[in-house]
UniProtKB/Swiss-Prot annotation:
F-box domain ranges (all copies): 29-75
Polar residues bias spans: 1-11
Kelch repeat residue intervals: 199-248
Organism placement in taxonomy: Eukaryota, Viridiplantae, Streptophyta, Embryophyta, Tracheophyta
InterPro entries the record matches: F-box-like_dom_sf, F-box/kelch-repeat_ARATH, F-box_dom, Kelch-typ_b-propeller
Descriptive protein name: F-box/kelch-repeat protein At5g48980
Keywords for the protein's UniProt record, in alphabetical order: Kelch repeat
Pfam annotation, one family: Kelch_FKB95
Amino acid sequence: MADSQRLSTASGVKDGQPPWKKKKLSNDTTSNPSLPYDVILIILARVSRSYYTNLSLVSKSFRSILTSPELYKTRTLLGKTENFLYVCLRFPDEANPRWFTLYRKPNQTLTDHTTKKKKKKKKKEEKSSVNLLAPISILNSHPVEWSAIISVDHYLYAISADIEKAPYSNVPYLDCRTHTWNEAPRMRLAHTNSEFEGIVYLPGSFESPDSLNCVEVYNTMTQTWKPVPPEKRMFKLENLEKKIYYKSFHLDSRAGKGLSLSYKSKHLTCGLVVLDTVDSYLRSSCMIENIAYFYRKGNFIWRGLDGKILVYGKIEGLEGLPKFSRYSSVQLAEYGGKLVVLWDKYVPASGYKEKMIWCAEISLEKRNGKEIWGNVEWFDAVLTVPKSYKILCATAATL
């Protein structure tokens, strides 16, 4: 009898139950993953966010983890954050704008359109685009209008276009982790933009530069506003050394000039710069490492400060980048230290209902201290849009 029991145990039969039946019962009653939550969190944090859409389909628990603040904190601690380009477009006859993000096939070999002689096999591969603008489903309503979108980490702040209404309304911001709109506390008097080290600096009314309301400071961590003290403001061109230079859209109607602010965030110090006559190209410009880039009349222009002197020039190189039509809409954006260019291909007024948006990624290199060269890493057709669409903004978020 003892030998029979030992044989049954050795063969996996116990209490008359075959092992496969007990295994099936065990699987049916186990709903939790075998790995601890912290381990799953670390594993998912190391995965490119480009895969998150597909991973969210695995289970509700995965979907919950992929949108949790803990995941993005872990990605930051592990140094796994990525830059994602967000693009907002307005389509005709639609009340709310549409949001898109630049989707790039993970670990892809960059498409090289700059080489004139290519193999036939490579040409076939390039016919299917690996870069595209993928639509985003926003879970709640958009702000009606804004004059600027400010990117701070994984938040996109929508600054009001109406300075009269700005002090009386909260500041909406898009949480790029969950794609939901939230509201920051209302500001006192401010409506233009830039950000640095988690602090948003907003120049206010030009008519009263000595007012306490002239510059508002918003701390994104504490979600509080406060004015810059008068003694911390310096509106002199000679005081711009080692300060960050950026655009704004004030207009001095008397001189026909655009105004920009330069600031040093740690010391709450501001400076005022007079630019050329305000034009629409300023609205599509972007800042990369304290240098402003914009597109005007077929050229990519850069502008920055060399000590106390304002310097500028044309981006050299750019081999392979197609020429844009004079009627094309062009938008520039900073994307992980590189320049992203969005433009549309011109179509005649009649006979066409749609057009194509193209996108290029350009790496920048300073040479000889006075030149900036651009290398076109790739460009692709990324989205088909109605002919009368409008680009509202393009900016990168860190996730």
